[in-house]
Amino acid sequence: MSDGNVAWILASTALVMLMVPGVGFFYAGMVRRKNAVNMIALSFISLIITVLLWIFYGYSVSFGNDISGIIGGLNYALLSGVKGEDLLFMMYQMMFAAVTIAILTSAIAERAKVSSFILLSALWLTFVYAPFAHWLWGGGWLAKLGALDFAGGMVVHISSGFAALAVAMTIGKRAGFEEYSIEPHSIPLTLIGAALLWFGWFGFNGGSALAANDVAINAVVVTNTSAAVAGFVWMVIGWIKGKPGSLGIVSGAIAGLAAITPAAGFVDVKGAIVIGLVAGIVCYLAMDFRIKKKIDESLDAWAIHGIGGLWGSVAVGILANPEVNGYAGLLFGNPQLLVSQLIAVASTTAYAFLVTLILAKAVDAAVGLRVSSQEEYVGLDLSQHEEVAYT
């Protein structure tokens, strides 16, 4: 690997790491002030747990010697034999895992024990994230099938989005969720988080080329395009319904970013426009569906990341342009890629939801996911951290 490529992956690693607190700020602004510290703290806890587990065995079972296409071996446990460029790749992938677990915190907003989240996140990385990473990026069965996931539409967004839905269904609604509106306490904080996420996504998608080359350039351009288109769609919807709220605009942009993630290295700008346009619509409809069904996954990891990642992963099979990276989708004469993508999407969606549901119920039965009603009333900043966000 050239010095320029090394520098780009180092920079991309730092950009992706910045997305972890970005998720924390994005979520913290949308909860009540008594839970703001907790949401940001959970993002840092996600990073800490991921770093430790990734070094001990997470990287190895994700990218180690293939075992029947299902999981990697333990040959890289404690980073044994991982040196040089492989060490850089390990660190880059570590940040992806950390961001994914941070996204999952949407499901437990304002009502979960920190200790239970630590246990659940460790189990989830082991039994959901690591298998997905191996299946698609580590030479597993979906990679052998021909499925493509450039930067994590399935590994990151489908996994975290559908897992969040399962956890939210297990932990139950927040107190007062159906009695009164629970409003964001700081939209500016959410906007800061969105800015960090959009900025970091250039390393997330651009760095996934694993080189400073034309594919990386294309990835950055289409990432920006899809985000802008989807954000514009939500802005227009806001105007149709009344006023274009800033929270809706940035939520739309994040939906566009999630949707382009699996496709960033395979589609051109025209494809990115289509992906962003559809993502803006379907993710908004998913959010509207969630509200009507009174599902308290209220920071919308499922609607934005889960549905966005699902659509983007399917779109790869339709819109992949061989001029970008050599892979052709349905519109360029290769229907087989769409078949592979549909199998991969169905498999990862079902697995993420069902396995997470089992893990969440197991943790809830063993130690309890939820804080007491009194602790929830006081707020998790005080009850879980003995701190307050504002004085």
From Swiss-Prot:
For this protein, the record's Gene3D superfamilies field holds: Ammonium transporter AmtB like domains
Q: Quick one: signal sequence residues?
A: none
Q: Name one Pfam family in it.
A: Ammonium_transp
Q: Which residues lie on this side of the membrane: Cytoplasmic?
A: 28-38, 107-113, 171-188, 238-245, 288-300, 364-391
**Keywords of the record:** Ammonia transport, Cell membrane, Membrane, Transmembrane, Transmembrane helix, Transport
- Identify the GO cellular component terms for this protein: plasma membrane
Biophysicochemical property: pH dependence: Transport is pH-dependent, with a steep decline at pH values about 5.0.
Bilayer topology reads: Multi-pass membrane protein
User: What job does this protein perform?
Assistant: Involved in the uptake of ammonium/ammonia (NH(4)(+)/NH(3)). Transport is electrogenic. Transport the ammonium and methylammonium cation with high specificity.
Q: Which NCBIfam families match?
A: amt
Q: What is this protein called?
A: Ammonium transporter Amt1
Organism encoding this protein: Archaeoglobus fulgidus (strain ATCC 49558 / DSM 4304 / JCM 9628 / NBRC 100126 / VC-16)
Q: What is the lineage of its organism?
A: Archaea, Methanobacteriati, Methanobacteriota, Archaeoglobi, Archaeoglobales
**Gene designation:** amt1
